[in-house]
C-alpha cells in the first residue's frame, strides 16, 4: 500500500470573506478588454440583493439567466450561441455548482468544432481532444456544496436522452472565485442540507475505497468530514452565524478542490448512481446522494472494511467501530439534518431500475469497478 505518483495543479485565485467583491477592483481581476457575460439561475440573486452588489463591480455586455439546477445541455446551447454572437471573452458565474458547471461548459462549447453537438465533451468522458476554452471564468459563489469554484470539473444533463455526465478540462479552472458567506445566508434549508451532504460525500468518495497510502490527505479528509458534521446543525439552525457559515463554505471548497485526491484514487460510485436518480426521478443532487451513499457503502462493505472502521473511529468517534457502525452513523447524520435516505420515502417506484442498471453495462463505476448492471441493480433494490 503506497502513495500514487501525482501532479497537483490548481491555478484558482480563491478570495474568501465578507466584502470580498471589493477585491475585484483591488486585485484588478477584470481585464480592461473584457467582454463579460454574467450567468445565473432562476433569479434568486435579484431577490436577495446579490445581483445589485455584483453589478457594482462588473459591467457585463450581456446576461444569461435561467440556468436550472442540474444544468441542461439544451439551456447551455442557447448561452453558447449568445456568447459567440457577442464575442464574449470573460464569463462571470454568479451562483452555485450548477451555474458554475454550466459556465464551464459554455466556455468549452464556444470552442467546440468536432460536431454539431458539444455534448461530445461529456459523451467522450473528457478523454478526446477538446479545444481549450479561450474565455476566462470568474465565480461569485452563492451556494456552498460542489467545490466547482476551485476545480476544472462539471456535470451536464441532456434531457433528450436522460443523460447526466461529467466532463473535465484544465482550461475551465476559474481564474478567480469569490466566496462571501453573507451571500449564502438567504438560502433555504433544503439547499443547505443538500450542500452539506454533497460536500461530505465528496470526502467519502476520496476516502473509503482507497488503499493507496497518503496519511496527510487521509487526516485532512477526516478533518473535513468532522468539520462538516460539527458545523451542520449550527449553520442550519442559525443562517446568520457567520463563523459557522464560512466554515461550511470552506469545508465544501476543500472537499473537492482536488487536494484530497493527491496520491489516492476516487471512488465516485454514489455520484454515478445518484446522477441516474436525478435523470429518471428528478431528485436534487444532494437528495440522491443521501440515498445512494449508504447503499454503496453497504455494497462495498467487505472490500472497504478497514477504511469504514477507520472512518467510524476517526470521524464519528465510535470506539472499536465496525463497518456497519460507520455506515449506520453516516445514515443517522443524514437523517439528523432532515434528509431522506430511501427512494421509497420520495414516493418513487422501481419501474426505472432496469433501465438505470443497464447504463452500467460495460461502464462499471466505483473504486473497485464493480458497480455494473448487477451491482447497480443490487444497490437500487437495497436503497428502495
Curated annotation (Swiss-Prot):
The keyword Oxidoreductase applies. Signal peptide: none annotated. It is an enzyme of class 1 (oxidoreductase). Coiled coil: none annotated. One of its GO terms (molecular function) is butanol dehydrogenase (NAD+) activity. It catalyses: a primary alcohol + NADP(+) = an aldehyde + NADPH + H(+). Its EC number is 1.1.1.2. InterPro entries: ADH_Fe/GldA (IPR001670), ADH_Fe_C (IPR056798), ADH_Fe_CS (IPR018211), BDH-like (IPR044731). Keywords: NADP, Oxidoreductase. Gene3D superfamilies: 3.40.50.1970, Dehydroquinate synthase-like - alpha domain. Has NADP-dependent alcohol dehydrogenase activity. PANTHER family: ALCOHOL DEHYDROGENASE YQHD (PTHR43633:SF1). Belongs to the iron-containing alcohol dehydrogenase family. This is NADP-dependent alcohol dehydrogenase 3. It comes from Entamoeba histolytica (strain ATCC 30459 / HM-1:IMSS / ABRM).
Amino acid at each position: 500500500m503506497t502513495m500514487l505518483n501525482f501532479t497537483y495543479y490548481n491555478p484558482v485565485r480563491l478570495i474568501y470573506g465578507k466584502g470580498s467583491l471589493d477585491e475585484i477592483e483591488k486585485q484588478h481581476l477584470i481585464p480592461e478588454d473584457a467582454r463579460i457575460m454574467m450567468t445565473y439561475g432562476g433569479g434568486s440573486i435579484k431577490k436577495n440583493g446579490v445581483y445589485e452588489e455584483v453589478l457594482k463591480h462588473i459591467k457585463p455586455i450581456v446576461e444569461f439567466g435561467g440556468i436550472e439546477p442540474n444544468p441542461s445541455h439544451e439551456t447551455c446551447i442557447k448561452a453558447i450561441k449568445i456568447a459567440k454572437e457577442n464575442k464574449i471573452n470573460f464569463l462571470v458565474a454568479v451562483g452555485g455548482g450548477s451555474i458554475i458547471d454550466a459556465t464551464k461548459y459554455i466556455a468549452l462549447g464556444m470552442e467546440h468544432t468536432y460536431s454539431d453537438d458539444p455534448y461530445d465533451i461529456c459523451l467522450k468522458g473528457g478523454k478526446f481532444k477538446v479545444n481549450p476554452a479561450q474565455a476566462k471564468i470568474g465565480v461569485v459563489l452563492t451556494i456552498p456544496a460542489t467545490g466547482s469554484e476551485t476545480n476544472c470539473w462539471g456535470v451536464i444533463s441532456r434531457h433528450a436522452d436522460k443523460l447526466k455526465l461529467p466532463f473535465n478540462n484544465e482550461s475551465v479552472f476559474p481564474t478567480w472565485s469569490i466566496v462571501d458567506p453573507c451571500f449564502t445566508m438567504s438560502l433555504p434549508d433544503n439547499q443547505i442540507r443538500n450542500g452539506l451532504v454533497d460536500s461530505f460525500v465528496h470526502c467519502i468518495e476520496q476516502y473509503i475505497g482507497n488503499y493507496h497510502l497518503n496519511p496527510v490527505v487521509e487526516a485532512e479528509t477526516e478533518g473535513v468530514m468532522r468539520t462538516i458534521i460539527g458545523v451542520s446543525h449550527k449553520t442550519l439552525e442559525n443562517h446568520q452565524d457567520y463563523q459557522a457559515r464560512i466554515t461550511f463554505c470552506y469545508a465544501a471548497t476543500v472537499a473537492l478542490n482536488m487536494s484530497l485526491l493527491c496520491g489516492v484514487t476516487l471512488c465516485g460510485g454514489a455520484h454515478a448512481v445518484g446522477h441516474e436518480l436525478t435523470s429518471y426521478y428528478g431528485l436534487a443532487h444532494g437528495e440522491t446522494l443521501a440515498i445512494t451513499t449508504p447503499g454503496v457503502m453497504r455494497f462495498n462493505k467487505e472490500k472497504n472494511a478497514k477504511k469504514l472502521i477507520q472512518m467510524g473511529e476517526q470521524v464519528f468517534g465510535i470506539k472499536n467501530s465496525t463497518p456497519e457502525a460507520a455506515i449506520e452513523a453516516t445514515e443517522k447524520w443524514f437523517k439528523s439534518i432532515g434528509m431522506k435516505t430511501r427512494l421509497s420515502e420520495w414516493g418513487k417506484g422501481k419501474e426505472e431500475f432496469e433501465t438505470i442498471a443497464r447504463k452500467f453495462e460495460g461502464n462499471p463505476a466505483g473504486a473497485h469497478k464493480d458497480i455494473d448492471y448487477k451491482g447497480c441493480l443490487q444497490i437500487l433494490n437495497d436503497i428502495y
